[in-house]
């Protein structure tokens, strides 16, 4: 999630003495905002297993100003029942904020499922070319005018005109790019699921995903990202990453170019080992963002890298 978009949308509604209930499976920087920064401002934060509606209900029983979650989560692909969590959050007197980066505006529509605010790192799929940094916040006109507008007007975290223009140009091709990326990601996920050197594949579009049925209800497709464990641990994982030729190593995602990263040592390196373990982020986990290259070329690069010594 874009830090400015994410922190900006929570601060107008969250004040010292109030509570934020969040799923624990978050992008590393967002986890830092929720778990470390908000408490410094006197805001109580509670992290729950986002898949467990009972955990949400228990945490929200004491009231909350904001509920927050990612679905699918980065990088373990946890799917959250957005409609159910929205109902529970509203019952507690709060608003639900959803980070919809992995799903994009095309594959999942949290506002239609009951969320109040949706945030995007526009740097990802919306730009799609790795050219600029930016975030986007979607909400009701009343929320924008009464809560978000004054905060932005007086603190100034606004896009430059040039970056805004780049993102608008990116939106023109978003549907075409995401459709191609999703098809490629699905093909890679199916291929890896049967590979002897892969011990686990996490992709919402696979029937083997533990929340496949929920993903089918909430999302139009499985998305453009695949996460998987390379058998053999960290050393084998790094060998695989270093051997890729067509795919670049980068923390970005949603780009026209296929990208991979090692979450345990990059996006989630700030977390303690036991925290990463609870989120299923092991040393063997790879996050793969499918780009626009030819599907056969990507599969060949992956196969060659897996067989490298």
Kindly give the residue locations of the regions a language model identified.
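Conserved PLP-enzyme active-site core in the AAT-like
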Residues: 1-5, 9-197, 202
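PLP-dependent enzyme catalytic core of the Aspartate aminotransferase-like
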Residues: 19, 26-28, 35-36, 44-46, ...
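Residue-level detector of secondary-structure transition/capping positions
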Residues: 64, 189, 245-248, 306
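A short, terminal or domain-edge coil/loop segment
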Residues: 76, 101-106, 151-154, 249-267, ...
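Short phosphate-engaging motifs
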Residues: 144, 188, 233-236, 294, ...
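N-proximal accessory regions
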Residues: 163-186, 191, 221, 229-232, ...
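Conserved C-terminal alpha-helix-loop-beta "cap" of PLP-dependent enzymes
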Residues: 200-286, 290
């Amino acid at each position: 999630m874009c830090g400015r978009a994410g922190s900006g949308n929570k601060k107008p509604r969250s004040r010292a003495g109030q509570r934020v209930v969040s799923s624990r499976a978050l992008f590393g920087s967002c986890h830092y905002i929720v778990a470390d920064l908000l408490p410094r401002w006197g805001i109580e934060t509670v992290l729950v297993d986002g898949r467990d509606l009972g955990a949400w209900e228990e945490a929200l029983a004491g009231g909350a100003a904001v509920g927050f979650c990612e679905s699918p989560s980065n990088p373990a692909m946890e799917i959250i029942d957005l409609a159910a969590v929205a109902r529970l959050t509203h019952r507690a007197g709060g608003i639900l904020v959803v980070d919809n980066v992995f799903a994009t505006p095309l594959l999942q529509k949290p506002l239609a499922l009951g969320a109040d605010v949706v945030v995007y790192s526009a740097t990802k799929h919306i730009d799609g070319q790795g050219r600029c940094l930016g975030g986007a916040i979607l909400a009701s006109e009343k929320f924008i005018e009464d809560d978000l507008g004054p905060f932005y007007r007086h603190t100034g975290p606004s896009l430059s005109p040039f970056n805004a223009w780049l993102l608008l140009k990116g939106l023109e091709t978003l549907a075409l790019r995401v459709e191609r990326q999703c098809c490629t990601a699905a093909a890679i996920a199916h291929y890896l699921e049967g590979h002897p050197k892969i011990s686990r594949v996490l992709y919402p579009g696979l029937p083997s995903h533990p929340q496949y049925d929920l993903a089918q209800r909430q999302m139009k497709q499985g998305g453009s990202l695949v996460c998987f464990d390379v058998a053999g641990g960290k050393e084998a994982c790094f060998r695989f990453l270093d051997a890729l030729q067509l795919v670049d190593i980068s923390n970005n995602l949603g780009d026209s170019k296929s990208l991979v990263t090692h979450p345990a040592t990059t996006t989630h390196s700030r977390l303690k080992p036991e925290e990463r373990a609870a989120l299923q982020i092991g040393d063997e986990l790879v996050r793969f963002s499918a780009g626009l290259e030819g599907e056969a070329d990507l599969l060949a690069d992956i196969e060659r890298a897996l067989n490298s010594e």
